[in-house]
């Protein structure tokens, strides 16, 4: 099955065919750097990171551009609130952004342009639109003329007559039409000198100018959250088509919302959790797994229960991985004939690719990984007749599927250690006390002092410690 993507522009799944063979140009709208990123931002970052990883897995050379909006009224307001320079606000929250992305194992894009480094490109684009009578200057502002673009509404499906009827309540005397939007806004400091007077760029022109510079007049994929379809991406199409006469993007891809109590998580509604808040209580990889457990276009419900469930799933994944690696530790995988070919033809690899080729259906892909984990655990226990070679091939197929999803970037031991540290922050348990009780239970069992063994076990249970007796001793972890 060839790769199929749902194109917001055509409202259907389409076979993905890039402009250039084995090359992909992808632009994703980044964050406005005035605050810490929330879980909604995490979802967008993880979704398009997974696209990036899967395209590379398929053998594409990907030029991935993700921008920073580093000039905006919100940034200036935050600078005033904190009593610092607006550029210091940028530095602070860009650094925080990179910290958050690192925790979530987000791969670095090819290019990460900042809006303020591309003012000249915006000037050039705005002037081109003015020269073609598709934009006009009005008292220091420059507006895009909606009437100059007959296809306005093609992405969102909105009717321009309905929009105009709704826009008449907010009259701006500077505009020829209430729907016209700003390309350049006259402003107080900070501002840039321009042919139209001092001011700042409009939000929409920033992305059009940067995507054009780094990916050309037309490129393969433009991504972002569903909330950007209108007006941001609709306006990008209008600007870019107006400037070049070409549709700027072949496939528009949008991820669904993260919801809390059936409402979109957002700063404007005040119902958001920052990535760093969540990662104090849950492992960052748990958050990543949770956010890819649903199809990227579907809404996903954020709740403690869902994160607890994701923790259990990821712990089970790492436990299975540890067992399989231990089972094949002494096997030289390189000596297995056609090892990589066998991995490529393994049933998990085939099912995983089929799911991912169906509009990047990570939910189904993870269901296949769950199924294969059960098979792998059975094989590790010596049941089912699987050879060590079979286990090694299945393990590698499973690892590669996880890598595409951005999972398993730690060893099982590292994951368990970090998970314990996160869970123990609130409980502040004494590890030496836990080890002492486990040793005491072991001694009591050897002496057949069952009452004492039960007492040690009960005390561990009260502490929230789960124990498991294995041939190699007693393993433990926190609930």
Regions found by a protein language model. Give the residues of each.
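Alpha-helical recognition segments enriched in aromatics with Gly/Pro capping
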Residues: 1-34, 49, 120-325
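N-terminal, positively charged nucleic-acid-binding surface of large information/translation enzymes
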Residues: 10-13, 19-105, 143, 469-476
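Anion (oxyanion) recognition and catalysis
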Residues: 56, 130, 461
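Short phosphate-binding/catalytic loops that engage adenosine nucleotides
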Residues: 60, 134, 465
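Short, glycine/charge-rich beta-strand/loop segments that flank catalytic centers
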Residues: 68-72, 94-97, 107-122, 140-149
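Short, polar/flexible loop-turn hinges at active-site or ligand-entry regions and domain interfaces
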Residues: 82-88, 109, 297-301
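Structural preference for alpha-helix termini/caps and helix-kink/transition segments
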Residues: 264, 272-479
């Amino acid at each position: 099955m060839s790769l199929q993507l749902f194109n917001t522009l055509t409202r259907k799944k389409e076979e993905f065919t890039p402009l250039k063979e084995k090359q992909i140009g992808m632009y994703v709208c980044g964050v406005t750097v005035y605050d810490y990123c929330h879980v909604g931002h995490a979802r967008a970052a993880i979704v398009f990171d997974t696209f990036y990883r899967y395209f590379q897995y398929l053998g594409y050379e990907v030029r991935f551009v993700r921008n920073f909006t580093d000039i905006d009224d919100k940034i200036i307001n935050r600078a005033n609130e904190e009593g610092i320079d607006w550029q210091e606000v940028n530095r602070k929250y860009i650094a925080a952004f990179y910290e958050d992305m690192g925790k979530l194992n987000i791969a670095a894009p090819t290019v990460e342009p900042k809006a303020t480094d591309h003012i000249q490109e915006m000037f050039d684009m705005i002037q081109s639109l003015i020269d073609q009578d598709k934009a006009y200057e009005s008292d220091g502002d420059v507006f895009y003329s909606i009437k100059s673009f007959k296809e306005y509404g093609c992405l969102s499906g909105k009717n321009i007559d309905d929009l105009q009827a709704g826009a008449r309540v907010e009259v701006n005397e500077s505009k020829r039409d209430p729907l016209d939007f700003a390309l350049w806004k006259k402003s107080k400091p900070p501002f840039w000198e321009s042919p139209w007077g001092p001011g700042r760029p409009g939000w929409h022109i920033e992305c059009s100018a940067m995507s054009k510079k780094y990916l050309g007049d037309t490129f393969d994929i433009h991504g972002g959250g569903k909330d950007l379809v209108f007006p941001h991406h609709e306006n990008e199409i209008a600007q870019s088509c107006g400037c070049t006469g070409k549709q700027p993007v072949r496939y528009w891809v949008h991820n669904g919302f993260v919801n809390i109590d059936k409402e979109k998580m957002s700063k404007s509604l005040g119902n958001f959790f920052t990535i760093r808040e969540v990662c104090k209580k849950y492992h960052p990889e748990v958050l990543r797994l949770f956010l890819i457990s649903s199809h990227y276009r579907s809404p996903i419900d954020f709740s403690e229960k869902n994160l607890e469930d994701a923790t259990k799933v990821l712990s089970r994944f790492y436990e299975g991985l540890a067992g399989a690696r231990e089972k094949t530790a002494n096997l030289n995988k390189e000596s297995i004939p056609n090892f990589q070919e066998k991995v490529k033809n393994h049933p998990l690899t085939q099912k995983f690719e089929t799911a991912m080729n169906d509009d990047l259906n990570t939910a189904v892909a993870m269901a296949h990984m769950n199924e294969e984990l059960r098979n792998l655990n059975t094989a590790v226990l010596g049941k089912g007749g699987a050879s060590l070679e079979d286990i090694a091939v299945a393990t590698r197929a499973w690892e590669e599927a996880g890598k595409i999803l951005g999972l398993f970037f730690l060893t099982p031991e590292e994951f368990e250690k970090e998970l314990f540290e996160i869970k123990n922050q609130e409980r502040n348990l004494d590890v030496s006390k836990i080890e002492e009780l486990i040793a005491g239970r072991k001694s009591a069992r050897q002496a057949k002092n069952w009452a004492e063994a039960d007492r040690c076990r009960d005390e561990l249970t009260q502490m929230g410690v789960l124990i498991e007796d294995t041939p190699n001793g007693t393993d433990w972890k926190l609930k």
